[in-house]
Structure formats: C-alpha cells, structure tokens
Amino acid sequence: MNVNQNKKVLFLTDIENGLEPILQEATNTSAENMLTIQSYGASISHPYGEIMRSVIFAIYQEDVEEIFVVGTKDKKTSAGNGLTQLETMKDKIQTLDYLFQNCKPEFLGGTVDEWLNENSSDTIEKSVDMIRHHPLVPSYVKVRGLFVNHKGGKPSIAEVPDVKTGQAMPDHCLS
C-alpha cells in the first residue's frame, strides 16, 4: 500500500488513540502530508452532512488525492450500547424507534440501537461508497477502506473490498 509521499492523504478514522503512526507506516505517508478527520465509528451517515462537508473541503483546499476510511476490525461502539440502556433515555428511544421503523426520510430504518451500534465493516463500506459516488468528489480521488486489527498485540491492516452498489444515497432520495 504505497502512497506517493508528496501528495496529501486524508484519513477518516475512529476516535482511537495510536492509529496515526500505524497508518503512516502502513500507507507510507509522512506526517506532514497526513490529514485526519475523527468521528465515532469513522462513518459518514449522510451524503450532505458535516463529515462529508469536511471531506469535500479537504479535497479542494488541501489538494487531497487519496482518502482512507479507517475502522477498527469488528468494533462496536460500546458508548452507544450504554446510551440505549439509560433509564432517562428510554422514552426518547421509544419515540425514535417509532420514527426509525416508520422510515421518515431523516431516519434510515432499523432501530436506535442498530444506528448507535452499527457493524464497523458495514459502516466503512458504506462510507467508502458514499465518498466514491458523491457528485462533488472528483473521479481522480482514490477512496479506500481499511481495518486496523489489534488482536495479538501487534496491529495489522486489511483493505476493505470494493462495494458494488453504485448507489451513494438512500432509496428515499432517489424517487
């Protein structure tokens, strides 16, 4: 996974300490050419949301030519699981679950628990696909997904296979 050392590379990562040195080594990217956007789960939940906006600004203002969406292998957001168990949240979650299940446009189906604790491999694949097919992302920008696996004490990196959906927006946006 050799990256041209003179070009800017954007990493959308999970909020986890210690990923930058691992990614620099794995992608052969120097610190001065590395830009990082951190979010819980390294996910882009909406094609016109704040994280996607930051990605687009990075592409045009920093001349980013390659983007890596980086997740931690099979990690689930433990904080999300804790939120759904709080007694003070139960009424709010019940209301939101109703909205999720009745597919209001701003909610993409499922439950609050599924939304908060989405599988990291699915999240990374969807985010990569959303960036690749976004109308404001130039075709020359390479977008790849990576998983960092910390099993065995030594981190390993695996590339996410390409998703073949070709659809970056939810179905309700296409009708």
Curated annotation (Swiss-Prot):
Gene3D superfamilies: Carbonic anhydrase. It comes from the Bacteria. One of its GO terms (molecular function) is zinc ion binding. PANTHER family: CARBONIC ANHYDRASE, CARBONIC ANHYDRASE-LIKE PROTEIN YBCF-RELATED. Belongs to the beta-class carbonic anhydrase family. This is Putative carbonic anhydrase-like protein YbcF. It comes from Bacillus subtilis (strain 168). The gene is ybcF.
